[in-house]
Amino acid sequence: MSIVTKSIVNADAEARYLSPGELDRIKSFVLSGQRRLRIAQILTDNRERIVKQGGQQLFQKRPDVVSPGGNAYGEEMTATCLRDLDYYLRLVTYGIVAGDVTPIEEIGLVGVKEMYNSLGTPISGVAVGVKCMKSVACSLLAGEDSAEAGFYFDYTLGAMQ
């Protein structure tokens, strides 16, 4: 839940106006909006590069994934793996834009471990792929922007533990 929604819900539950502290937090959130949008735009503009290089790093670190019998063996399964990585990158951009993990959690992480287990896909391999994408994505950003994006990648990774 965004800081705006959370503040309004809390104030309304107490039948009061927003406090000066809540208004300050909302102001900070709004002022950080341009930065969050810029970060999301950079990641979106570079999504093919991030997914491709992240996938290449995954396959170097985990060659078993693309070896015969691996979950990403063959062209079709490799494409499926890269599609999944792209999905997690998209979720990260949603979180960045919202300034909150709720979209990541509600759209894409509920039942993620169970889903991959039911498919016979080790979640650890998916997590390595997301970690590799984090490395590529954060290399495109500087300082606070990199830390901001890193937070949402880390949140996604935490749900895969």
UniProtKB/Swiss-Prot annotation:
Presence of the UniProt keyword Electron transport in the record: yes
Protein modification: Contains one covalently linked phycocyanobilin chromophore.
CDD domains recorded: APC_alpha
Residues where N4-methylasparagine is found: N71
Membrane-protein topology: Peripheral membrane protein
Residues holding (2R,3E)-phycocyanobilin: C81
Annotated compartments: Plastid, Chloroplast thylakoid membrane
Keywords: Antenna complex, Bile pigment, Chloroplast, Chromophore, Electron transport, Membrane, Methylation, Photosynthesis, Phycobilisome, Plastid, Thylakoid, Transport
Keyword Transport in annotation: yes
Gene Ontology biological process terms, A to Z: photosynthesis
One Pfam family named in its UniProt record: Phycobilisome
Main location: plastid
Entries under Gene3D superfamilies matching the protein: Phycocyanins (1.10.490.20)
Entry GO terms, CC: chloroplast thylakoid membrane; phycobilisome
PANTHER family per the UniProt record, alphabetical: ALLOPHYCOCYANIN ALPHA CHAIN, PHYCOBILISOME 32.1 KDA LINKER POLYPEPTIDE, PHYCOCYANIN-ASSOCIATED, ROD 2-RELATED
Subunit record text: Heterodimer of an alpha and a beta chain.
Protein family per UniProt: Belongs to the phycobiliprotein family.
Function: Light-harvesting photosynthetic bile pigment-protein from the phycobiliprotein complex. Allophycocyanin has a maximum absorption at approximately 650 nanometers.
The protein, known as: Allophycocyanin alpha chain
The species this protein was found in: Pyropia haitanensis
